[in-house]
Amino acid sequence: MKQYLELCRRIVSEGEWVANERTGKHCLTVINADLEYDVANNQFPLITTRKSYWKAAIAEFLGYIRGYDNAADFRALGTKTWDANANENAAWLANPHRRGVDDMGRVYGVQGRAWRKPNGETIDQLRKIVNNLTKGIDDRGEILTFFNPGEFDLGCLRPCMHTHTFSLVGDTLHLTSYQRSCDVPLGLNFNQIQVFTFLALMAQITGKKAGKAYHKIVNAHIYEDQLELMRDVQLKREPFPLPKLEINPDIKTLEDLETWVTMDDFKVVGYQSHEPIKYPFSV
């Protein structure tokens, strides 16, 4: 929690106002933020200065792992995070590539599981990484990226947290995740959970020990209509100790994640929090 609160205070005290064309709002912005999560000791980075709904964050990333491209599939997992971008984004609604209600296009997990080659074939980036790590191989290119500029026009949203690099040192697995843009009051809450859980899951299904997860954010910002709640409410609260994340030990393969895993296979233990804060969301 300390590093999260320090970033929030840094934005409030040092940030500069930047106009955002997509949302029509101004953002208080800082450039470059680095966070670390201790996955080895299960220090689950769940925000405690407001109630955090962690299941939706894990459900969303599970949808990425499965390569989902439809908001209805994400809802079935337990998260509505793609409803607005799939169905209320004006630019996407006018895009001729949109295939109807709930279609997200070729975003996130689609790129991770079915990146298109020039000859029409696809590359399953995640499968390659899992196969290598399971064999104890780190070719220094165990990289999963959702960032495909050639297909930005085929999706409703460019990826924010776009690239994940795995590093194997002995039998300990580490993760470095890169994020181009972060809505700190709303998005970072989700993204921290996802980075931590992704490393924990990948270590579990490849038979490795989880180490540290490193989370690099380029543009960290607070929207103008979020600033008062952050400055005058959330930053006035004292944080509680971090909880633990328990993952069903029966999850042993990528196929398990693709097929039968649900939110019932995850449990957070020892979570204490302050009251919820309803921050505005910008589509």
UniProtKB/Swiss-Prot annotation:
Subcellular location(s) of the protein: Cytoplasm
Metabolic or biological pathway: Pyrimidine metabolism; dTTP biosynthesis
Reaction it catalyzes: dUMP + (6R)-5,10-methylene-5,6,7,8-tetrahydrofolate = 7,8-dihydrofolate + dTMP
Cited Pfam families: Thymidylat_synt
GO cellular component: cytosol
An example Gene Ontology molecular-function term: thymidylate synthase activity
CDD domains tied to this protein: TS_Pyrimidine_HMase
Keyword Magnesium belongs to the record: no
Chain positions recorded as dUMP binding sites: 22, 180-183, 191, 221-223
Its EC number(s): 2.1.1.45
Origin superkingdom: Bacteria
A Gene Ontology biological process term: dTTP biosynthetic process
Keywords for the protein's UniProt record, in alphabetical order: Cytoplasm, Methyltransferase, Nucleotide biosynthesis, Transferase
Binding site for (6R)-5,10-methylene-5,6,7,8-tetrahydrofolate: 183, 282
Major location (coarse): cytoplasm
Enzyme class: transferase
UniProt-annotated catalytic positions: 160 (nucleophile)
Record has Methyltransferase as a keyword: yes
Physiological role: Catalyzes the reductive methylation of 2'-deoxyuridine-5'-monophosphate (dUMP) to 2'-deoxythymidine-5'-monophosphate (dTMP) while utilizing 5,10-methylenetetrahydrofolate (mTHF) as the methyl donor and reductant in the reaction, yielding dihydrofolate (DHF) as a by-product. This enzymatic reaction provides an intracellular de novo source of dTMP, an essential precursor for DNA biosynthesis.
Family stated for the protein in its record: Belongs to the thymidylate synthase family. Bacterial-type ThyA subfamily.
Oligomer and partners: Homodimer.
NCBIfam families: PRK01827.1-4, thym_sym
Name by which UniProt lists this protein: Thymidylate synthase
Organism, as annotated: Haemophilus influenzae (strain ATCC 51907 / DSM 11121 / KW20 / Rd)
Gene this protein is translated from: thyA
